[in-house]
A protein has these predicted regions:
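Terminal amphipathic alpha-helical/low-complexity segments used for targeting or macromolecular assembly
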Residues: 1-54, 181, 185-186, 192
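Structural signal for interior beta-strand "rungs" in well-ordered beta-sheet cores
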Residues: 45, 49-146, 150-191
Length: 192
């Protein structure tokens, strides 16, 4: 299994405190729910505004009126949330990101400068700095038999676990990643 620093740069997310005291990177995901409100409350008030209870939005961020945001959620500065985006709660989105049309995100951390622009599902996942999902990319988070996700022989004790995507990754259109997939830094997956 790759080391944390070989996959992502935790300085590129306001959720970096979640990565302390973990053995495996996926152990961050269950910590989001218990910690996101504390992270939100500690954000710089000059950079973030609470637009609704437990929904924090950074300066110069554009949120389309046809998007849906369920609390708790943190959205960084200079980010764009486009029409039809559905943020289902326990979501941390970085600065300079795009969450596009018909994109659903839940219980995930999206690092700075990442783009999820069209018709994507991102559940129980981590997208590293400057990553991009092509149109229709799905990060599947549940096996058909609903058994625990196992990564390289290690039982994660999680039924729902999407993908861990490293820094500078580009995943081509219509790719579907199996639950528990880990993609290292500087990787391109060609479109289907």
């Amino acid at each position: 299994i790759m080391k944390l620093e070989e996959i992502i740069d935790i300085s590129k997310t306001v959720g970096n405190s979640l990565f302390k005291d973990i053995t495996y990177i996926w152990e961050v995901l269950p910590k989001i729910e218990d910690n996101i409100i504390d992270i939100g409350n500690s954000l710089d008030k000059d950079k973030y505004t609470m637009i609704e209870e437990n929904i924090w939005v950074g300066n110069n961020t554009k949120i389309d009126k046809l998007s849906t945001i369920i609390a708790p959620c943190i959205i960084g500065e200079n980010t764009e949330i486009r029409p039809g985006a559905y943020l289902r709660g326990n979501v941390i989105i970085g600065d300079n990101c795009v969450i596009g049309n018909s994109v659903e995100v839940k219980n995930s951390i999206i690092f700075d400068n990442s783009q999820i622009p069209h018709f994507n599902y991102v559940g129980d996942s981590i997208l590293g700095y400057h990553s991009h999902l092509g149109a229709g990319v799905i990060l599947s988070n549940l096996k058909n038999d609903e058994s625990n996700i196992v990564i390289k022989g290690i039982d994660t004790n999680m039924i729902k676990l999407g993908s861990i995507i490293g820094n500078n990754v580009n995943i081509g259109s219509n790719s579907v990643l199996y639950p528990g997939t880990i993609i290292g830094c500087n990787t391109s997956i060609y479109p289907l």
